[in-house]
Amino acid sequence: LFHPEQLISGKEDAANNFARGHYTVGKEIVDLCLDRVRKLSDNCTGLQGFLVFNAVGGGTGSGLGSLLLERLSVDYGKKSKLGFTIYPSPQVSTAVVEPYNSVLSTHSLLEHTDVAVLLDNEAIYDICRRSLLDIERPTYTNLNRLVSQIISSLTTSLRFDGALNVDVTEFQTNLVPYPRIHFMLSSYAPVISAAKAYHEQLSVPEITNAVFEPSSMMAKCDPRHGKYMACCLMYRGDVVPKDVNAAVATIKTKRTVQFVDWCPTGFKCGINYQPPSVVPGGDLAKVQRAVCMISNNTAVAEVFSRIDHKFDLMYAKLAFVHWYVGEGMEEGEFSEAREDLAALEKDYEEVAAEGVDEPEGDDY
């Protein structure tokens, strides 16, 4: 599946330290990475863009991830970059300095990705436990299988034939109203185990309703607290446009799904005839049809404000900051990244409120 020449590994880890991943260890390995990317891109006839997967809680994902994105922007300026980023969860934490790493990393995600899909382990754990999968103690493999379904749905239209195919740049066009407002929520349905799939009726309206459920969101964030700006529904399998239109019409009448008033249509639908495939012996049932939703909702700001709050508590005491400065970072970078995120939260507030009264001074 992966050519061994394209697998790059390092000998040391970034010790949960953004500065180490970005400046110390990252600097040594990033040229090798870009060299391999260049070889691959030279073989492409029409390079469309990059999919970047990282987690921003640790040091390597945040530091090296940011560095790589920055360098890709330099080398391939116009190509689109889609990020799938795992953010720290509200309750489940893997490192003390997660808030620092996330804030520093989001600073470059803001500038160097065109669309970023936010994921968080806790939300996906809950989906595994609570949904029809009933996995008592989900492992990372279980989580990854769910995430991979979403990613697979996003790229199906590049790989197979369908009635309404959606290519990668189309996501950007339809989902991003302003360049900075590009952090997406994702959800997938049906998440159902093989044992239960036999007696469940999984019609198009049913799976469409399911992806709008707050409990289906792959990041801990309640879409009912915000408004939708746009959403992309990718159906795959046995689905016809008539059913999709009917299902979308029903969603539009629901009080719980609110759209911003400056975006009246808000839905982009794609249909692909290739039914979803599953890992043999995996948790998910083989189903006739499935849908994946990527949505731009103002409630995503909750994810950022949670991290910012934790960041502020530690930074007020300058706790752990010396580890970062010791690896060649400047203290000013902390406040710069934090201000950038504060501005982002403000951007989301304004977007949600626009139309009620026009904000003074146009930032865009």
From Swiss-Prot:
PANTHER family: TUBULIN (PTHR11588). The record marks Y364 as: Involved in polymerization. GO terms for biological process: microtubule-based process. Its EC number is 3.6.5.-. This is Tubulin alpha-2 chain. Pfam families: Tubulin, Tubulin_C. Tubulin is the major constituent of microtubules, a cylinder consisting of laterally associated linear protofilaments composed of alpha- and beta-tubulin heterodimers. Microtubules grow by the addition of GTP-tubulin dimers to the microtubule end, where a stabilizing cap forms. Below the cap, tubulin dimers are in GDP-bound state, owing to GTPase activity of alpha-tubulin.
